[in-house]
């Protein structure tokens, strides 16, 4: 009887494992989204309550790392959804052929420039900015050119554009301001740079530990300190040239093992439950008209929004990264 019992037990285990795999939604995202203090746990709990499934967040360093991982795995990716790319990576991500169209109605999104893309669903947006401590700096730079060209008293930390969407955002921000003169600008910024980190979390932690005067982040970052910590000493430097806008997006992987669950989650992204987790979970603006928490009204609002088209970024990104790299090795 024992061999028979063993076979029954093995069949039960196999069946259970198969059921678990069929009911697990795998989402590639970045580390701060999936972290205990990020929006991931709250979103996971909310979606699992309606899907009768398990949500498995696979945390990578940053948005560019997500795209790099997807490319590396190709058609063998375990991801059902990628969440954490941004508007600047969309064209490049589409060219992989690894993503498929969504069936989500995005008509009610409230993005500054609207939304009509059929592959990507937006889930939050914000503007890149340099955060500083007002108790340590009374006179922040009032423009990118002031920071780069005249403020030799300041030390900066930012992220690598090859692995980080904020780092890429700074690269695009610098290019939009300096154009053909950007190499010289990078060289000047290099003399003020403490380090270039792989992702946002490492950079921001170093700044909070006092290792720099400024850190590349978002205009919404001070809201975290104000709301979560009741600390009003952090602010962002408002630059006269304007600030580069980022829209973060999610997409369904073409080879998704759990296609129906993926479709369900893609629609869930624009629900009030998901969107209300963005301001105080991801510390970004929601893309629908959910109410913003008290404290967001104190944030600096850029006087101008800067951007390149996704197609232009896809065409020029490698060249602009080489510009950045060559400037750092002068």
Task: Please describe what each predicted stretch is.
Residues 24, 28-40, 61-65, 77-212:
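Extracytoplasmic ligand-binding site segments that recognize negatively charged/polar headgroups
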Residues 41-57:
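Short alpha-helix C-terminal cap/hinge motif
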Residues 88-92, 208, 212-233, 282:
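A ligand-binding cleft/hinge motif common to bilobed small-molecule-binding domains
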Residues 99-106, 118-122, 145-148, 214, ...:
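Short beta-strand->loop
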Residues 112, 126, 186-190, 196-197, ...:
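Periplasmic-binding protein-like
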Residues 129-136, 175, 246-258, 277:
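A bilobed periplasmic-binding-protein/Venus flytrap-type ligand-binding module shared by bacterial periplasmic
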Residues 253-308:
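Mature extracytoplasmic/periplasmic domains
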Residues 295-330:
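Extracellular/periplasmic bilobal clamshell ligand-binding domains
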């Amino acid at each position: 009887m024992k061999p028979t019992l063993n076979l029954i037990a093995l069949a039960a285990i196999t069946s259970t494992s198969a059921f678990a795999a069929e009911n697990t939604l795998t989402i590639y995202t970045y580390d701060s989204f999936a972290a205990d203090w990020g929006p991931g746990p709250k979103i996971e709990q909310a979606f699992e309550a309606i899907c009768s499934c398990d949500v498995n967040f696979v945390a990578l360093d940053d948005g560019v790392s997500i795209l790099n991982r997807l490319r590396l795995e190709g058609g063998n990716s375990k991801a059902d959804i990628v969440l954490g790319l941004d508007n600047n990576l969309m064209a490049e991500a589409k060219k992989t052929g690894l993503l498929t169209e969504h069936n989500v109605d995005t008509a009610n999104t409230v993005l500054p420039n609207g939304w009509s893309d059929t592959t990507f669903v937006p889930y939050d947006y914000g503007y890149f900015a340099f955060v500083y401590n007002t108790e340590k700096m009374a006179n922040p730079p009032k423009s990118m050119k002031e920071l780069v060209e005249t403020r030799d008293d300041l030390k900066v930390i930012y992220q690598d554009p090859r692995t980080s969407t904020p780092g890429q955002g700074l690269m695009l921000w610098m290019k939009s301001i300096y154009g053909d003169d950007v190499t010289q600008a990078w060289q000047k910024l290099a003399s003020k740079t403490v380090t270039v980190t792989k992702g946002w979390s490492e950079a921001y932690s170093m700044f909070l530990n006092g290792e720099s005067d400024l850190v590349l982040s978002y205009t919404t970052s001070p809201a975290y300190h104000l709301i979560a910590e009741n600390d009003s000493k952090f602010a962002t430097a408002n630059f006269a040239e304007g600030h580069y806008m980022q829209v973060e997006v999610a997409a369904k992987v073409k080879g998704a093992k759990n296609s129906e669950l993926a479709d369900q989650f893609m629609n869930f992204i624009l629900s009030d439950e998901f969107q209300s987790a963005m301001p105080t979970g991801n510390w970004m603006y929601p893309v629908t008209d959910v109410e913003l928490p008290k404290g967001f009204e104190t944030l600096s609002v850029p006087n101008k929004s800067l951007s390149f088209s996704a197609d232009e970024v896809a065409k020029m990104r490698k060249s602009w990264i080489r510009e950045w790299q060559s400037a750092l090795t002068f």
